[in-house]
Structure formats: C-alpha cells, structure tokens
Amino acid sequence: PLYSSAASDVYKRQSLGHQVEEIAHPIDHSITGRAMSRMINTYTYQSVGKRAKELNLPLDDCPIEASTLAMAKRGQTTSAIAYVDARNCLIEAEQQLQDFYQQYDVIIQPVLTKAPAKIGWLDMNSQDLREYGGRFTAYSGITALANGTGQPSMSVPMHVAEPNLPVGALFTAAWGGDAT
C-alpha cells in the first residue's frame, strides 16, 4: 500500500511522453548480494584490522558494533580467490546491466521496501546477526545493487503517504549515464 500510489505516479510519466513498462529486474540480487557482502566484509576487515593494530588491540576487543565486528571477522577469513570470485560476479552483473540498458534508459524502483523503521528496529549490536542481516537486506531493497555495480542513481520523492511521509523512487541509469 505504501508504494502503490508512488507506482501510479511513475505511470503518470507516460503523459509526459515517457514509455513506462513493468518488468522483472534483470539481475538476481541474491547472487550479487552475497558477492557484495563478501567484498564489504573484506574491506571492513581491512579498515578495522588496521585500526586494531594501531591501537594494539585484538580484533575482538575493538569498541565497535557487533555487526561490524562480525563483518570484519568474516572479511579476515576471506581468501583471495573468494574475493576475486565476488568481484567477478559484480563485473558480470555490470555487463548484464549494460546489455539491459541497450533497451531501457532507466530502472525506477522503490528506495526502501517498507516504511521507515522505528529507531532500534535495525540493531547493529544485536546478538542475532542473522536477524540483523535479514532485516537489513529486506529493508534496503535493491539500492545496494546500484552501488555495487556502479550504476548512477538518484532518490526522488514521488508520493506523500500518511502521515506526511515522502515515498521515494530510485531512478537508476547505465554505468556512465549520469546525464540520462
């Protein structure tokens, strides 16, 4: 219900001369999501591990959120081959999107998958990191895919829901298509 009015606002763009089609997203986000997580974990370890060494602290004693520590630990154990496989997965997604953008100018999708959460709903210090990860992934939608594949995107308010809540649509273009 939150996005139904925003979706109808997207279709109003047809009156401005745009062709609007409802299609399935061309990328399997579950596969690219795992690849992005592996890369993010590796970079998190690179940053946190470096700081831990500077402070002469074991990784477990770093004063950081539980979720950040878990990501750093996963990154610490990521092999070079696993990292390269993850990067190759994103390169393949980038290429698939380039093919997609031969036919379409932009993808328009919700910025978030649900209304803004109450403070604390996404607890970075949760002891249940599966729940944290599941909530994060379910809430953030496809936005990370645009970031991970280098697609230029902008969040545009498309509708106002009750109580005076702006609902955004994410307009995403081809890599290098910032002027689209």
What is each of the regions a protein language model found here?
Residues 1-7, 11:
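Single conserved hydrophobic/aromatic residue that forms the stacking wall/gate
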Residues 15-27:
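Flexible, glycine/charged-enriched surface loops at secondary-structure junctions
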Residues 30-41, 123-125, 169-171:
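Short low-complexity, flexible loop/linker segments enriched in glycine and/or proline
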Residues 39-98, 110, 114, 155-165:
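Short helix-loop capping/hinge segments that flank enzyme active sites or metal/cofactor-binding pockets
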Residues 105-106:
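Short, Asp-centered acidic motifs that coordinate Mg2+ and/or phosphate
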Residues 117-139:
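Short, surface-exposed loop/helix-turn segments at secondary-structure junctions
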Residues 145-148:
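Conserved short alpha-helical elements in the N-terminal third of ANL/AMP-binding
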Residues 165-175:
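Short, well-ordered beta-strand elements
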